[in-house]
Amino acid sequence: MSRSNFSCDAHMFKLKSPYKPTGDQPEAIEKLVAGPAQQVLLGVTGSGKTFTMANVIQTLQKPTLIISHNKTLAAQLYQEFRDYFPENAVSYFVSYYDYYQPEAYIPQSDTYIEKETNINDQIDKLRLAATTNLLTRKDVIVVSSVSCIYNLGSPVEYGKTILELAVGLKITRDQILMRLNDLQYSRSDYSFHRGTYRVRGEIVDICLAYEDSAIRLTHDGAKITKLEKIDPISGTTMNYELKTMNIYPAKHYIAGRDNQAE
């Protein structure tokens, strides 16, 4: 957990629990908060280590990265911290491979084995939601496996590619579609799913890569006239209109046009 001077609002993290720290927990929380930056919390199974750390987050009020040594424990911690902090951006970031077979060569039989992978679509969505939360919020807890140490590309380039939409914005439909392509969204007029968009006249529907919702954009040929959040399956409006909306990349590996030219 970082102890750097991070500017954040008071009571940004709100711990929700019917229980209070008991036994050795209050002393452990106090020492973890006041002690050196690098410490180890030891405890038997069921002693409330996760609850203790939730109280540390509540006290320090700082964005937190929690690294687990495997995906199973990371999933358990993710659910527990979501229960403790239902109003905050608790995110899940682990490897999205259900199966990974690296390429290999067997000299004894002169056999080449091609690389084979199977990506979990739900985990990919949660990974994108984690990085989107880091760009848009301060009250972020990321529960991760060691996959978080690997490079995802430049966060500067990732942030530059954000598509900012607003009702009344003067932009052509073709410019919007070009920017969606830059964000790695693909056009799919007949199979609308996560990370795609479809075009019907002056209406553009965008199925967000990091949420279970979609955005409907209405254009009059010169400017955006309406922004709505819709259900991606039924296409029905989710009861309210938007004034502004930012669209974040559909994939982590993003290169700006200048870098693509190079």
Question: Where are the predicted features?
Answer:
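ASCE RecA-like P-loop NTPase motor cores
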Residues: 2-262
